A protein has these predicted regions:
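Basic amphipathic alpha-helical segments that dock to polyanions
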Residues: 56, 60-63
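A short, conserved structural fragment
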Residues: 64-73
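Alpha-helical linker/hinge and terminal dimerization helices associated
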Residues: 66, 95-107
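Basic, amphipathic "hinge/linker" alpha-helix immediately C-terminal to the N-terminal HTH DNA-binding motif
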Residues: 75-99
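Exposed, interaction-prone assembly regions rather than primary DNA-binding/catalytic cores
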Residues: 113-120
Length: 120
């Protein structure tokens, strides 16, 4: 089937979902925020090797706008900002884990990553 015949070309829920979480950094940001529970901007940036301040700030604004993370400002000097996952974000994580499992099973052996053991 060519992409012109695809029934997903108009108002596709999957396309909408990918517009919310697509891009190079959004899934990594969501996973980092969710794993931390609550995290400050600089701590989050430290977990994302290679991301610029501009890209991180933009992605965080989009994720907040789309209801996937909460932003809390604290009136202190210097100003403090924390990010936390929303309930929608928490519901998304098992789906991302399934997608990761699917992708890992399809990856060539030299590109496959080993899942990190969670501390007990």
């Amino acid at each position: 089937m060519s992409h012109y015949d695809c029934p997903c070309m108009e108002k596709c829920p999957l396309h909408y979902a990918m517009s919310l979480i697509g891009g190079k950094w959004k899934v990594q940001i969501l996973c980092s925020v969710t794993n931390a529970g609550t995290i400050r901007y600089n701590a989050l940036r430290g977990k994302l090797d290679g991301i610029s301040n501009t890209v991180l700030a933009s992605a965080l604004r989009e994720l907040e706008r789309d209801g996937l993370i909460l932003r809390r400002e604290y009136l202190e000097v210097p100003a403090g900002v924390e990010y936390a996952p929303t309930e929608d974000c928490r519901r998304l994580l098992p789906i991302l884990e399934q997608l990761s499992d699917w992708a890992e099973a399809r990856m060539p052996a030299d590109e496959s990553t080993t899942k990190k053991e969670e501390p007990q």
